[in-house]
Amino acid sequence: MLNYISVICLAKLERRRNSDDEIDVEIDLGAGMPKYPLELNDNILWVGTMNEDETTKSLSDKVLDRGNLLSFPRPKEFISRAKANSVEAASMLPKNVWQSWLDANVIEEEQFISRIDKYKKGLEAVNEAMEFAGRALGHRVWQSIENYMANHPKVIAAIQAESFDAGVCDLAMQEAFEEALVHKVMPKLRGIETDGETKTQCIDKIESVLFGPNGKDGLAPGLQADFEHAKKNAYETFIWSSAKYLEIEE
């Protein structure tokens, strides 16, 4: 149900972007009252949170493509809580802080432009390999990955540093690319068979792009342990269900 609501809201927001017509969403007020039409002006954003874990069904590609996702590794040590204390509400975000985040985007910076092309070509190679399994990536996936990398705090810090360090910048962009792959590409590989021709023509080719032909010089080496884990399960299909790459960053 939550997935359905998410898709409906996203569809209306997309219509708002491409149309001058009045777009509204009907709010159920209860008590037998008529539904209240809320016009989706430019000053209205749809914000909500939900967990995707073993208690929920998988979210659709549409929701994953347009959502902002957070991944967490499994806890290595459990923390006790004797008493559940109430959490104070966070203060409102000042507009100037929000604007500073928008202004920090480095997508037009030369150091970013000169490094992003190899990731674009790599993702195109992944897309080509996915064709054998009847899967594909669209323009939106690449655009979201590119913008994710351009807005990543580590990438921004590396490019805007007073003393630019190419090695630090390269590592920051690699980590940002890895995070974006987990959120935008790995869900699209779910269910692909990990044996037979599908393995050799799809999974193995993707693996070669991400980790290199001999396990070296790939675009996303930090994801190798998770990728191996996704291939090895009783169903013999690709299922991404771990976050070991976050433990590496720690």
What kind of region is each of these model predictions?
Residues 1-250:
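C-terminal regulatory/interaction module of P-loop NTP-utilizing enzymes
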